[in-house]
Amino acid sequence: MEAETGSDQQLRDVLEIASALSSEADLPRLLDLILAKARALTSADAGSIYLVEKGKNARFGLSESGEADVDKLWFAAAQNSSLEARSLGKDQIDPDAIETNRSQVFDVRFPISAERLVGWAVLERETLNIPDVYHLDPSLPYQFDASVDRQLGYRAVSMMSVPMQADNGDVVGVLQLINRKKDFRFVITPENATDNTLAFDRSDQVLIEALSNVAAVCVQRTQLMASQDQLLDSVIALMAGAIDAKSPYTAGHCERVPQLAMMLAKEAEDQQDGPFQDFAFEDAEAWREFRIGAWLHDCGKVTTPEYVVDKASKLEANFNRIHEIRTRFEVLLRDAQIARLEGRLAGGDPAQLDQDFEAREQELQDQFQFIAAANLGAEFFDQEKITRLQEIAKQTWVRHFDDSLGLAWEESQRRLAHAPATDQLPVVEQLLSDQPWQRKKRSESEALPEGYGFDLDVPEDTFNYGELHNLSVSRGTLTPEERYKINEHVVQTIVMLESLPLPRELMRVPEYAGTHHETLRGDGYPRKLPPEKLSVPSRIMAICDIFEALTASDRPYKKAKSLSVAVDILAGFRDRGHIDSDLFELFLTSDVYRQYAEQFMAEDQIDRVDIEKYLKAT
């Protein structure tokens, strides 16, 4: 068997390097690796990588300043063994240490120009191999900029600038090697540089050109993966922003919940003892997975009708029907006025008639005020109030106009199916009523999706617009049908996300996004999951979703709660078994609640919170 030649060894080295590069997905680490391997192959004291950045502002091809947004070179990475050794006070360089070198990153960008060595390499797609950059022919289009040497206290001599060209012909950057050394262990200074460096020879150039092409493919792949991640993140943020913008009643919610969730998750991961000492996300991808789940936790709200989300009063549909009912009261008052006048014409006692009218007017005023207050849903509407509502509703008024005219097709079909338009006008009707045609039956397409483990009580109707049905709601403004429609957003969130071909590193996004309404009592929705099936990130989402909703100052239907009131309400959720007590305690003791408040709450909301009364006795 023939002995292995130097070129065979170099080829083996390049293949091993190519294999190593192809397995690295992190761009900074990839650039470190490319530089270290290229320098090791050529005994280069220093090296740099410049990456091409395409002009990013596509609007009319102009930048924010109005100038053409041209392609630029980004000084992305640099290594220099001699400068590092000198900074550490060493008089010799360990050749093995090159593998552990970490690049400096300079936030420097400049237009691609043939006047610079690296710019010429990009534009001409050719390698520049220069024995001494300080002795270039002045007639050449490119020249060396010695200002960096003067700034660093260095002396570049031999330099090779190699374009990094991918398979598709694109030049993604330039790999630049500086000062091929006679003895790699030697520390170069401006005084000894020329005596201790060699020019890069032809074999060096061939080798590095081959390596550069492999590196270009790896860089391009890594940049593509990063840009895909960035695009996905941007689309997710766009969707979350669209949901927030869809309704002023949820403005900012989808943006703030992820930030609060990340804050609390970071505190949980930092715990060295206690219930969260073993909690940690595996890596940066796991953190990103959680962040995306948090961003998408309300994505199902794109299917929720705005007027349901925005319903600020019980009788509100696409308009507030309290105005219609007030008109009926006006009719009853007008009837009372007519009755008084008719009584006078019939010879009745004017004083008694006036007294009866004033009593009736006051009664109607009181009744309407009662209904108007009930419509707001601000107070609990108990059975006694429901009984009074039903008594008021029994009053009658006379309708003289056909109520089947001017209806949209769907509503007219419901109306005609239950009450054909054969009534003889005028018609005597109750003041308030629930009519069969005011109920919109649930269709088969609206059935709860199967195969997801959903456990929800589904109302018979999709909507019920009955006046008594709506006014009799005991808490808030939403009927059972509307409450289900709101809660259904989590169902849609899970169905939407589980239908996506998510990569392995994002497989838990549906879990994180779809469990923030589950409880530790096992009675949450949409699956009534037991506590053992709720991960720490899922429990974090539940706390953050509630706290953000309590403290939001941009909701037009309610006054924002103070910090102390919000914490007290959250403690109630803890006491009733809705949220994790350990996380709630960490939320307080880590000061996350206050950090969030200072960043997102109005100054007049932030007051003192006595957290001691909420902490478990030890």
Language-model-detected regions and their locations in the chain:
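A short, aliphatic-rich beta-strand micro-motif
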Residues: V157-A166, V171-Q176
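Signal-transducing coupling segments at domain and membrane junctions
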Residues: A114-G119, E126-T127, P131-M160, F184-L198, ...
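Helix-loop-beta substructure at the N-terminus of cytosolic sensory domains
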Residues: L15, E24-G89, S113-L117, E124, ...
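Divalent-cation-assisted or electrostatically stabilized phosphate/pyrophosphate-binding catalytic cores
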Residues: D195, A199-S203, M239, D310-A339, ...
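GAF sensory/regulatory domain recognition
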Residues: S48-S113, L136, W295, N320-R328, ...
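Signal-transmission/dimerization alpha-helices at domain junctions
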Residues: W120-T127, V174-D183, S203-A226, A242, ...
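Signal-transmission linkers at sensory-effector interfaces
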Residues: M1-L33, K37-L41, L62, V206, ...
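Amphipathic alpha-helical "output/dimerization" segments
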Residues: M1, D13, D170, F186-Q220, ...
